[in-house]
């Protein structure tokens, strides 16, 4: 008797892969369940910008043939996943959530897409996002907003909103997102899933539509810590096509997963719990810290004194890099072109005016101003100096602890439309996550409960030393094992 499609969709990534390996279920069954789930729910969620049903079915048939021959490529072989629409996919539209890339069909795959497919994972589609990954609510998508599965009137977070919503709603078993200032961890916290921003350079950025090149990093989202660890192990590693890619060997993140929290030193930054947090979020975070103490970890008071300057530094550095990266969208080489323009100069201006949304335009203006003659030293250079101070703060804190723990966001998921009229309020959603990117450190969001008042998920942020993702997974798994899984969100 076959397993109902809804039950297949709620299987963990490794659980689904094990079922295919044991021939208890087929990849084709998993993919059909995923496609049916997307068809049934995405009209309300808006998590997908494109679904590649025919390609997914063909990949599933190939995975089933490999399983029949006993030639499975990995634990991911035959399992449905999806990727943020910021990764180029050969022959499949890639928009980065922007009208200026509407209709663009890349001639190649991003490295992370290649690695997923080489492992046998079945990519069923491309996920909704804020335009060029600029946003914290997914409301900056040029195509449609994405909704939180826990409450359709609320944001799933951004910019990887579709990546988090699709996993939380059971449309796919895992997804990929990007994180420039919190864009994996914030949606993961809002949607009650696990989200990982690896160390800068741990995962190749080749084939990722660039926002801020010194901050962007690729990472997984999944419903279980171990599943996220498996996906990261699959996509991590050196890539000669990315000059920022590290040659450091990739750890086996699954090996220490069940080692528990005993003996860990958990740093708690006093600046992160000294105000500005909603009461329900603070209560859940403090309860998670108490859980670590009960499990045998030692809580250590640490200080990150320059973290208060993180937002200011980030919103000088990131827009400066974005203004350079987005200069390539000129209507000449690819993407939208103002064909009715009279002359080259007008074509440049009109193509960008019609193709770019309000938030990219705002950040291009900010970045161009920060880099302009007479202001470079006063703004951009000073922001880079603050970045160095933030990195030194973390270095000093890690002298006395193994991981740093605190909130991911100041609040639970907020209402759609609540902050769109106030960009500064929107930017403050990333106040606890941005410093991790500025310091190039690995960070992770793991569910730590539901806020009592709203019943919405709260995430705990864990930050580690460079390239020590293994300790983050160990610490996150200890909490996950003790607290148990969150309930599934309501049916859309």
From Swiss-Prot:
Top-rank lineage group of the source organism: Bacteria
Q: What class of enzyme is it?
A: ligase
Q: Which residues form a coiled coil?
A: none
The active site lies at 84, 159, 183
What keywords does the record list, in alphabetical order? ATP-binding, Ligase, Nucleotide-binding, Protein biosynthesis
For this UniProt entry, the molecular function terms from Gene Ontology, in alphabetical order, are: ATP binding; glutaminyl-tRNA synthase (glutamine-hydrolyzing) activity
A GO CC annotation recorded here is: glutamyl-tRNA(Gln) amidotransferase complex
The biological processes this protein is annotated with in GO are: translation
Per the UniProt entry, the Enzyme Commission number(s) are 6.3.5.7
HAMAP family listed in its UniProt record: GatA
Q: What does this protein do, in the record's words?
A: Allows the formation of correctly charged Gln-tRNA(Gln) through the transamidation of misacylated Glu-tRNA(Gln) in organisms which lack glutaminyl-tRNA synthetase. The reaction takes place in the presence of glutamine and ATP through an activated gamma-phospho-Glu-tRNA(Gln).
Q: What is this protein called?
A: Glutamyl-tRNA(Gln) amidotransferase subunit A
User: What is the protein's species of origin?
Assistant: Anaeromyxobacter sp. (strain K)
Query: What phylogenetic lineage does the species belong to?
Result: Bacteria, Pseudomonadati, Myxococcota, Myxococcia, Myxococcales
